[in-house]
Amino acid sequence: MTQSPLAGKVAIVTGSGQGLGLAYAQELARQGASVVINDVNQDTADAAVESIVAEGGKAVAVVAPVGDTAAATALVNGAVDAFGRLDILVNNAGVLRDKSLLKMTDEDFDLVIKVHLRGTFTCVRETYRYFKENGVAGRIIAIGSPTGQYGNFGQTNYAAAKAGIVGMIRTFALEMKKAGVTANAVIPVAATAMTKTIPFFQKAVEADERGEAMPSFFRRDLGFGTADDVAGLITWLASDDAAHVTGQAIGAGGDRLQLFSHPTPVVTEYREGGWSYEALAEQAHGLFEGKLQTCGEKMPPLPEELQPAQG
């Protein structure tokens, strides 16, 4: 009998009481890992634990709002107290406070940054501290977003946090390499409670709710699917099979898998003495013509047969 790839491993998944995080936790458990569920609500966390235990897996709950060091420490201690060790951290916890720039308050900005960006920082730091002190060649997986890669209207706070996470991952990979620890970002594209309210995705959501596969346009052309479509990538990155992969941003959704490039110049020009205003005014238009980058994710037209119902 083939041994499960994560047998004997212990994973923390932040924000795993429901949604994407729960799907990640359930798949990690299915592949043999013992899992620490994290949520801010005790009942939600307990239900998530029960869903894993009912399938023969091992899980415990740590109820804490991710962001501060105290929560990160509680998660690490919870893993070690329950299962004796820690091998994998999946940073998934997040909140949304979507508003256009002039309507976004300091509180809207700070909360999203605290949970996503600071929460990733504190949880990774305390997990890596454990890895270093105990000689564990562990796995760090943080969740990014297409919004962090491309930008999106009304999500200044979220875009900043998710872009920052990918930047931190590249730095973590450099700092952790000698310890044998890998750090990667996953960019998921999957149905959530939010996408259910967007008419563009109506036919995909309806198919999923009927237990049917989403139309190929969504799964293939958009790379849009279910949480389960992303969970396999999370589990693979957590395994020994992915020990050579670090510092990467990898997208998953529907039938599509994407490896994102690091930011790289598309135009490089030199001018002796540097680039003054006058030199730029004279040459920049020609140098940048056809090379300026777009902002936001571009959606292909929705086929006629997949148009949302009217009324």
Residue ranges of predicted features:
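Canonical Rossmann dinucleotide-binding motif of NAD(H)/NADP(H)-dependent dehydrogenases/reductases
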Residues: S4-V36
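The beta1-alpha1 cofactor-binding region of Rossmann-like NAD(H)/NADP(H)-dependent oxidoreductases
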Residues: Q42-D43, V63-A74, D106
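Substrate-binding pocket helix/loop in short-chain dehydrogenase/reductase
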Residues: S100-L101, T105-I113
